[in-house]
């Protein structure tokens, strides 16, 4: 079954002349744990561990994971062509080195930039020489039949006696720091940080009380980008009272495009996906500050 999926993927790669396709363990927010919808690496390799990365080429398929999962990976990969690369062991190439060994100069590397952190993308770019990265390819989504639905849990308000600090107090601290550094906008892509900031919770990821969402904070606005299906009247009223504007999840891209020229934006490249980061970069004159 896994080999059949890999062959389907290779057919799509061939059509677009992609030499290697990289599949991380990630979602658009670089969460440590994933909703079932985003378990693309598990789908293409059969490995169910919570950490790892896969690379599929024309003739090879590899999985990189750490020592916690060596035995599990051996068992789960044994009926497929996927080769286990034991990270940290002597003589085992990194996935960058593997790509350099099997893909020629100016070859094409494909990945889904929606589920790839800019931090890791930059590391990949810095380690593969003159190869070309195409970051708008969701091949796993194209071949995944009966894919689980996207997470859609209902938001709820965390009582202030548990939260310990009001939303306005937290926003004031952020805006004070923004002002001291001359920052016009702060982008937050981490669901746990967003839920902490706004004192809300959800169940979009099993055992993690978070909501898949983005936030953009300016001097005068705080916008929560989230599926409206997750927000009932009570939560909507609560957010409104706290001067938090609600917009649909996908509207983040349009708002990034509308950021005034020469604005200074703060973000975390480890928790910002390539698609979002590039949307900011496309503004040309927008200056990005990061935590790394």
Predicted segments with their positions:
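Conserved small/polar residues in nucleotide/adenosyl-binding loops
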Residues: 286-291
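Short glycine-rich phosphate-binding loop at a beta-alpha junction
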Residues: 108-113, 263-269
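Extended, highly charged accessory segments
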Residues: 268-282
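Acidic, metal-coordinating catalytic cores used for nucleic-acid/nucleotide bond scission
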Residues: 115-117, 271-272
């Amino acid at each position: 079954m896994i080999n059949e999926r890999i062959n389907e993927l290779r057919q799509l790669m061939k059509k677009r002349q992609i030499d290697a396709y990289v599949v991380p363990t990630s979602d658009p927010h670089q969460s440590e744990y994933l909703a079932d919808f985003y378990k693309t690496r598990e789908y293409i390799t059969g490995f169910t561990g919570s950490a790892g990365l896969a690379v599929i080429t024309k003739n090879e398929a590899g999985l990189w994971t750490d020592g916690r999962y060596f035995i599990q990976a051996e068992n789960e990969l044994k009926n497929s062509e996927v080769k286990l690369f034991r990270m940290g062991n002597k003589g085992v190439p990194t996935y960058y080195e593997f790509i350099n060994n099997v893909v020629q100069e100016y070859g094409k590397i494909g990945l889904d930039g929606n589920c790839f952190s800019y931090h890791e993308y930059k590391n990949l770019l810095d380690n593969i020489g003159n190869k070309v990265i195409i970051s708008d390819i969701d091949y796993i989504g194209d071949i995944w039949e009966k894919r689980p639905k996207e997470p859609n849990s209902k938001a709820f308000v965390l009582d202030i006696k548990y939260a310990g600090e009001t939303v306005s107090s937290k926003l004031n601290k952020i805006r004070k720091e923004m002002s001291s550094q001359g920052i016009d906008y702060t982008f937050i892509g981490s669901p746990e940080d967003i839920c902490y900031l706004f004192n809300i919770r959800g169940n979009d990821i099993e055992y993690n009380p978070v909501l898949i969402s983005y936030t953009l904070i300016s001097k005068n606005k705080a916008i929560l980008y989230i599926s409206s299906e997750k927000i009932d009247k009570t939560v909507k009223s609560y957010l409104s009272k706290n001067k938090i504007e609600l917009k649909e999840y996908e509207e983040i891209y349009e708002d990034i495009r509308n950021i005034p020229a020469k604005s200074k934006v703060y973000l975390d490249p480890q928790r910002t996906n390539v698609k979002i980061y590039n949307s900011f970069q496309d503004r040309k004159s927008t200056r990005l500050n990061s935590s790394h």
